[in-house]
Regions:
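Short, charged beta->alpha transition segments
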Residues: 84-89, 134-138
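Alpha-helical scaffold segments in soluble metabolic enzymes
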Residues: 21, 33, 37, 73-76, ...
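Glycine-rich phosphate-binding loops that contact phosphosugars or nucleotide phosphates
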Residues: 94-222
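HTH-adjacent hinge/linker in prokaryotic transcriptional regulators
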Residues: 1-2, 6-85
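Short amphipathic alpha-helical surface patches that mediate protein-protein
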Residues: 6, 39, 94, 233-237
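Internal, active-site/partner-interface "lid" segment
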Residues: 223-245
């Protein structure tokens, strides 16, 4: 489901237009709409079914199987990630006074991790990980001059919609990291980075997202190495001061 029309066309030996027309013949407006529909079907798979299907695909060496699955997911990430989009995302984040990382559920620890990395590299950062009514408190953190990275997979959650509305009101740029929401949200964000979490219907792997987050952080460090190195040197001094070096 991650392939673009051009990639799918190349693999099938047909034109891009043929792929789009086929999706339309099935009753969809185009490939993005078909992708969202398929994702919706996958969302209906229960967690226990995901585990069952995942275990059914494993052999005797679970570690090797897990590593092979991760390598395959990272290969998809690298092959389908546009270099210009990645560079644009780094440019957006690099121009912000503060970075906000939004993620709930399993994505919340990734948002926390990204926030820690950002702070260490001299980029003031904050993780927005609350949901429900408490998500409104997180939205208060959005201020002009900041930039938001939204980690959102599968269906569109209400708090993400609210965040995008508030960010638009404040002219705060948003970088969306997602699997299938580009077609639905692409025109509401400054940039979209497609990051797949493994085969649909199986247990999701968040390792590709972590790799992407770390790559974004390295991109920021490369954009301003003096700032990153100065912050890390200060961190070393503070560790010595607190006895944690």
């Amino acid at each position: 489901m991650v392939e673009s029309a051009s990639t799918m066309a190349g693999e099938l030996g047909v034109s891009d237009a043929t792929v789009v027309r086929t999706a339309q013949a099935l009753g969809y407006g185009g490939l993005p709409e078909l992708r969202r529909a398929l994702a919706g079907q996958v969302e209906d798979v229960t967690l226990d079914e995901r585990l069952h299907h995942s275990l059914a695909r494993t052999g005797n060496d679970l570690l090797v199987d897990a590593a092979d699955s991760l390598v395959a997911s990272l290969d998809v990430l690298v092959r389908h990630m546009s270099g210009s989009r990645f560079d644009h995302a780094v440019e957006i984040l690099g121009g912000a006074d503060r970075l906000l990382w939004s993620g709930i559920g399993p994505s919340a620890p990734l948002a926390d991790y990204a926030s820690v990395l950002g702070g260490r590299l001299g980029r003031p950062s904050l993780a927005l990980t609350r949901s429900g009514p408490a998500a409104a408190d997180d939205l208060l953190a959005l201020t002009p001059g900041s930039a938001v990275v939204v980690l959102s997979y599968g269906r569109l959650h209400r708090h993400v919609d609210a965040l995008l509305r508030h960010a638009d009101d404040l002219a705060v740029p948003v970088v969306l990291v997602t699997d299938v929401l580009e077609g639905q949200l692409g025109d509401r964000v400054a940039e979209t980075l497609v990051c797949w979490r493994g085969p649909p219907g199986l247990f999701a792997s968040h390792a590709p997202t972590m790799v992407l987050v770390e790559a974004l952080m390295m991109g920021l460090a490369r954009a301003d190495p003096g700032r990153a190195e100065s912050s890390l040197a200060q961190l070393e001094d503070l560790r010595a001061l607190t006895g944690t070096g």
